[in-house]
Amino acid sequence: MNDEYELLDSGNGKKLERYGNVILERPAAQAVWAPQFPDRWEKATARFDRVGGLNWEGRNRISKPWNVDIAGVTMKLSATDFGHIGAFPETRTLWLWIRSTLKEQIRKKGRELKFLNLFAYSGGATLAAAQSGAQCCHLDASKGMVDWARENAALNHLTEAPIRWIVDDVIKFLRREVRRGNRYDGILLDPPSFGRGKKGELYKIEDQLMTTLDLVDQVLSDDPAFVILTSHTPGFSPIVLRNLLAQFHEDGIFEYGEMLLTGKPEVNELPNGNWARWINE
């Protein structure tokens, strides 16, 4: 399986990553240690920082956009004004797990499974699920990001795959799904610390997450496979995420951990968010 992402180094509040043939230096506040490989930083194609604003150096040296394979999913990348590029590779191990788990559960249950991706961004997890043969629903409040995810679907030859593309506020959408009786076998949600819905609806994780999880529980099928909760919000540790899921699921298996940016074995891993999942077994 192709994977063209690699963490090259981190330290002094920054990270150095390779996306295909592009090497980027960007902020990583949690990297409070000294870099391991100082010479590698000179090879950066472009640099982004937030000192005195949002600034790219060398942005013109990046072909825009460019495509990279991450965990078996081809992603279109582009250097945005805010420093994001269209992929969060710390989630790639979750993509691998979602793909393999859904494929196995489809075989085991002998029926089609439905996967729901909430706050779905550019669609890496959606496309990994689609590659397993699952029916997918991809939801994000940003039309631009949903369009980006659809472009990624085309890059992966999944234009005709059974994927619903939804631009909407998560809570409004889930309430409609409850009323309509639509149910899902696997659900991933990556709520932001702060966000706005399609019509400006305010989403704050500390205020809306419990409501969201309650609605997620209501749209699960009678024989679901899993629920995955991830977060980049400080304070929402793996144990916190696990405990949140445990309020809605007494039985089953709970797994949790940090999301990590990784490279070759000698490179320090860089934590970048947390995850927890409930598995129905």
Map each language-model feature to its residues:
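C-terminal catalytic and target-recognition region of SAM-dependent MTase-like enzymes
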Residues: 224-281
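Conserved SAM-binding motif I beta-strand of class I
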Residues: 135-140
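S-adenosyl-L-methionine
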Residues: 142-188
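Conserved alpha-helix/loop element of class I SAM-dependent methyltransferases that forms part
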Residues: 89-109
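Conserved SAM-binding loop of SAM-dependent methyltransferases across substrates and taxa
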Residues: 122-134
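Conserved class I S-adenosyl-L-methionine
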Residues: 110-121
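A short glycine-rich, Lys/Arg-flanked "PGG" loop and its adjoining helix->strand segment in the class I
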Residues: 207-223
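Non-catalytic substrate-recognition/targeting regions of SAM-dependent transferases
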Residues: 2-20, 24-89, 96
